[in-house]
Amino acid sequence: EPFKISIHL
């Protein structure tokens, strides 16, 4: 999920 990856970054 791109959204979760963005939060991780």
Curated annotation (Swiss-Prot):
A single GO BP: defense response to fungus
Residues modified as Leucine amide: 9
GO cellular component terms attached to this protein's record: extracellular region
Expression by tissue: Found in the hypopharyngeal glands of the worker honeybee.
Location in the cell: Secreted
Keywords: Amidation, Antibiotic, Antimicrobial, Fungicide, Secreted
Acyltransferase is among the record's keywords: no
Domain of life: Eukaryota
Described function: Has antibacterial activity against the Gram-positive bacteria S.aureus ATCC 6535 and S.saprophyticus, and the Gram-negative bacteria E.coli CCT1371, E.cloacae ATCC 23355, K.pneumoniae ATCC 13883 and P.aeruginosa ATCC 27853, and antifungal activity against C.albicans. Lacks cytolytic activity and do not induce rat peritoneal mast cell degranulation.
Protein name per UniProt: Jellein-3
Source species: Apis mellifera
